[in-house]
């Protein structure tokens, strides 16, 4: 049986004594890969969690820790470090209390993601159709700076949705459709970071 502590200790021997520069980050990724290649299942997640925390500690000298954690929550940063740093740099500059409030309202509303498709025929309020149209304009084929700007631009439609629409409608189909709409919106936030950690 492979012992997790032994695996991690062996992998840490691959790390340089100094944590300065990109060498540490690359060796950290290598150490994690060394461990993961020898195990499977749940223990793999535990190993990645350990090394992701090491990465966050290292990078917290340069970036806010909550931003690092938010950007690591939905995508494993060790899989694509370049992408991770790009997202961290953009989210670290975020200065939109209204966007944060809306994103967290969506996250609080969704105890779990809906697995249903949004059905336009079930819309009862104009704000529902408006929000869907706005969500559909958000493109991932842009820089993260531009992506964040898109989220900020659609936020008035998110606010109007919450002002005009009672999500938990007494009609179960209408309620489920609204939760599906919010799940779609949540996926747009999650592409960048877990806003609940900001």
Roles of regions detected by a PLM:
Residues 1-198:
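Amphipathic alpha-helical "coupling" segments that flank catalytic cores
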């Amino acid at each position: 049986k492979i012992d997790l502590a032994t695996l991690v200790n062996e992998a840490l021997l691959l790390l340089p004594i100094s944590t300065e520069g990109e060498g540490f980050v690359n060796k950290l990724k290598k150490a994690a890969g060394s461990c993961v290649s020898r195990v499977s299942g749940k223990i793999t997640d535990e190993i990645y969690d350990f090394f992701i925390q090491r990465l966050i500690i290292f990078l917290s000298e340069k970036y806010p820790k909550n931003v690092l954690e938010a950007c690591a929550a939905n995508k494993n940063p060790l899989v694509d470090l370049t992408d991770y740093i790009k997202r961290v740099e953009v989210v670290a500059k975020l200065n939109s209390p209204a966007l944060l409030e809306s994103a967290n309202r969506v996250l609080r509303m969704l105890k779990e993601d809906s697995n249903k498709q949004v059905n336009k025929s079930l819309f009862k309020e104009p704000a529902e159709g408006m929000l869907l149209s706005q969500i559909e304009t958000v493109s991932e084929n842009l820089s993260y700076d531009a992506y964040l700007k898109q989220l900020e631009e659609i936020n008035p439609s998110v606010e109007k949705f919450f002002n005009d629409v009672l999500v938990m409608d007494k009609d179960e189909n209408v309620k489920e459709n609204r939760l599906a709409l919010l799940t779609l919106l949540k996926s747009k936030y999650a592409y960048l970071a877990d806003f609940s950690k900001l």
